[in-house]
């Protein structure tokens, strides 16, 4: 990569990061209470939208100055609607409240935000170690977890790209753009990263095959289709941290030489579809997608494809047939086959 090009990439991203940092600092340094409300599908299904509206109405009714910060799924769906209240002037650490319906929202606004009584009977735990309230980290459900993929879920606003960038988002893409694609593939191979399916196919090997597939048009496909009853891992990530998925796809596309990518997600996930579509638009507006990503020679267009919800389309060959406009049925091919037809021209695909 040209050093002058690297400098341009750094300059463009630094300007974006400074804006993100400014917004984050303004939010954190604002002395008013912060109300964090989970608005992923699990929360909404439990009444989180009504909870949010109740907080908004109660803040106005009791003349309380506070900020509402919507986030994704914290991973504790059994406790929804989940609300975390950070009230600096109360002397208490940020508090995790569970099953906060509209009535509890009004009560907490009056008694805690206005009068300083945290109502311990509704407290699940504190979000920080302290001497007043048991920390959630003391509970088995928390202290045995080491979050990797979901580390930021439930802490950032999935509909605010600056929230993600302020937490280090897109910095890996910046690093990748300064490397040769072969170097990226080598790093992925050395990491030992594998697919989470039964075969556990090495990701680095898959990227290597796609990278070496020649000059034909290449497409990266994100398989976010889930047919197993009750499965919602992909939905949770797309709803709670969509830019993490987009950044990973961008790195993959750069490494294998693709200029187009598709997120295949079932139409039965309307919230995930809407959030990731908005995230793609935000990233494009900031120059993190589209033509000349961050001033580099790398172009990438990402689109969302809505699947019809067929169970079998979670299988990659059926998924590709669905994208092509055919009925989503598996076809008998080798486990990894990169020369396929998508539309009318030969292309190389990596999942």
Predicted features, each with a name:
Residues 1-351:
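Feature of Fe-S/electron-transfer and energy-metabolism proteins
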């Amino acid at each position: 990569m040209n050093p002058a090009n690297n400098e341009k990439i750094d300059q463009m991203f630094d300007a974006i990061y400074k804006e993100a940092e400014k917004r984050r600092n303004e939010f954190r340094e604002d002395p008013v209470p912060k109300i964090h409300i989970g608005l992923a599908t699990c929360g909404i299904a439990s009444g989180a939208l009504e909870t949010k509206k109740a907080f908004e109405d109660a803040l106005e009714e009791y003349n309380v100055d506070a900020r509402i910060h919507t986030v994704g799924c914290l991973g504790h769906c059994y406790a929804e609607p989940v609300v975390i209240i950070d009230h600096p002037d109360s002397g208490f650490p940020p508090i995790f409240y569970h099953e906060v319906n509209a009535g509890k929202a009004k009560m907490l606004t009056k008694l805690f935000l206005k009068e300083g009584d945290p109502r311990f009977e509704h407290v699940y735990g504190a979000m920080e170690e302290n001497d007043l309230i048991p920390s959630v980290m003391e509970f088995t459900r928390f202290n045995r977890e080491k979050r990797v993929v979901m580390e930021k879920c439930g802490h950032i606003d999935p509909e605010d790209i600056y929230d993600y960038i302020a937490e280090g988002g897109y910095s890996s893409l910046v690093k990748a753009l300064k490397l040769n694609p072969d170097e990226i593939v080598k790093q992925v191979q050395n990491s030992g990263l594998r697919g989470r399916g039964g075969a556990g196919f090495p990701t680095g090997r898959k990227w290597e095959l796609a990278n070496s597939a020649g000059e034909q048009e290449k497409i990266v496909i994100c398989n976010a289709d889930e047919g197993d009853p009750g499965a919602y891992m992909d939905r949770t990530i797309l709803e709670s941290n969509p830019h993490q998925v987009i950044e990973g796809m961008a790195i993959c596309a750069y490494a294998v030489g693709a200029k187009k990518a598709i997120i295949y997600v079932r139409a039965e996930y309307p919230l995930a579809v809407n959030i990731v579509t908005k995230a793609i638009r935000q990233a494009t507006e900031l120059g993190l997608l589209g033509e000349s990503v961050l001033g580099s020679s790398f172009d990438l267009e990402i689109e969302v494809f809505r699947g019809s919800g067929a169970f079998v389309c979670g299988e990659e060959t059926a998924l590709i047939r669905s994208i092509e406009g055919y009925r989503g049925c598996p076809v008998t091919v080798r486990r990894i086959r990169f020369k396929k037809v998508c539309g009318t021209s030969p292309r190389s695909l990596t999942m």
